[in-house]
Swiss-Prot record:
GO terms for biological process: DNA repair; sporulation resulting in formation of a cellular spore. Residues 218-235 bind DNA. The keyword Lyase applies. Involved in repair of UV radiation-induced DNA damage during spore germination. Can repair thymine dimer 5-thyminyl-5,6-dihydrothymine (known as spore photoproduct (SP)) by in situ monomerization of SP to two thymines. This is Spore photoproduct lyase. Its cofactor is [4Fe-4S] cluster; S-adenosyl-L-methionine. It is an enzyme of class 4 (lyase). Belongs to the radical SAM superfamily. SPL family. Residues 77-305 form the Radical SAM core domain. It comes from Bacillus subtilis (strain 168). One of its GO terms (molecular function) is metal ion binding.
Length: 342
């Protein structure tokens, strides 16, 4: 995806128009000539066009729903943060392996919430509860928030809010390069801006509808030069023919692009490919021609939260992946911090 996301269809909850952002977005999309429909609830969007499941799925991915977030209880977001902060749900990307395939289920449309101040007030309450500890908030658990922020500027508002806080830190990750409007945000070093990166094979075969790797790396350089703490998530680390060379090439590219003066505070998060049985069913339905390897027989089973287990690589494969990636990071980014491998 080279151009910033523009929805083909917009739904608005009437209550959203009681908030300035809701009104602003309605005006914006009217001026752009985009069809706007009313929906009673952002959870009950019906009549998305399409003759069959695949058409409806693809159309849903280019549909934006403007709503009010009613649930202000934040979920946990370990290991990346204490809490997930819910500014948006859903994503315009088509990553075959994404866990949102199952958590979003029958609602793959993108939702943005306009009661931003209420969400930030709730974050402040969580910070007070945990004082004097720092509290980290993850803004990309259920969406790629950067992908829609050129339209909403919600993320920019949040970055500046956390920039003024004493005990709050914001984090998010993106596969999009449309970051220019965020470069002048007053972040005060309180927001870690992370990019999802991967071997060429994975991006080419499993990440349609996202920015190319070179564009992500270019954006990462801009972000680092704007003074943001920078991070990279390598996920999913995926075994494929020539994977050792593929991942080495990724780190060589990153090393060639990142200036030395922005390397003093870089983090890496490493996540091996995993899938659940329900995810496999949904992935094969939504992307019937995918090359993604989803063979339970080749994997080992690991129990997860809520009793839903996942299939991950065998111990020897996991060890090889971890050893290879950690050695590349050690070679090219010896001062970086590896936050976790999972």
């Amino acid at each position: 995806m080279q151009n910033p996301f523009v929805p083909q269809l917009v739904y608005i909850e009437p209550r959203a128009l009681e908030y300035p952002l809701g009104q602003e977005l309605q005006d914006k999309f009217e001026n752009m000539g985009i069809e706007i429909r009313e929906t009673t609830s952002h959870n009950q969007v019906r009549n998305i066009p399409g003759k069959n499941h695949l058409q409806q799925y693809r159309n849903a991915k280019s549909t934006l729903v403007i709503g009010v977030r009613k649930t202000l209880k934040f979920d946990s977001s370990k290991p990346s943060a204490e809490y997930a902060i819910p500014f948006a749900t859903g994503c315009m990307g088509h990553c075959h392996y994404c866990y949102l395939q199952t958590t979003m289920g029958s609602k793959p449309y993108i939702r943005t919430y306009v009661n931003v101040e209420e969400i930030l007030d709730q974050a402040d309450k969580y910070m007070k509860e945990r004082a004097p500890e720092f509290t980290r908030f993850e803004a990309s658990c259920t969406s790629d928030i950067v992908g829609i922020d050129h339209l909403t500027h919600t993320l920019k508002r949040a970055i500046e809010h956390f920039g003024q806080s004493d005990l709050g830190k914001l984090r998010f990750v993106t596969k999009f390069h449309h970051v220019d409007h965020l470069l002048d945000a007053k972040h005060n070093g309180k927001t870690r801006f992370r990019f999802s990166i991967n071997a060429d094979y994975v991006i080419k075969n499993f990440e349609p509808g996202t920015s190319p790797l070179d564009k992500r790396i270019e954006a990462a350089v801009k972000v680092a030069k704007a003074g943001y703490p920078l991070g990279f998530i390598v996920a999913p680390i995926y075994i494929h023919e020539g994977w050792e060379e593929g991942y080495r090439h990724l780190f060589e590219k990153l090393d060639a692009a990142l200036p030395q003066d922005v390397r003093h505070d870089i983090t890496f998060e490493l996540i091996q490919h995993r899938f659940t049985k329900p995810a496999k069913r949904v992935i094969e339905k939504n992307y019937p021609k995918t090359k993604l390897e989803l063979d339970e027989e080749k994997r080992r089973y690991k129990w997860g939260r809520y009793g839903i287990g996942k299939y991950i690589y065998q111990k020897d494969e996991e060890h090889a992946l971890r050893e290879a990636l950690e050695s590349y990071i050690d070679t090219f980014f010896p001062n970086a911090k590896i936050e976790y491998f999972t």
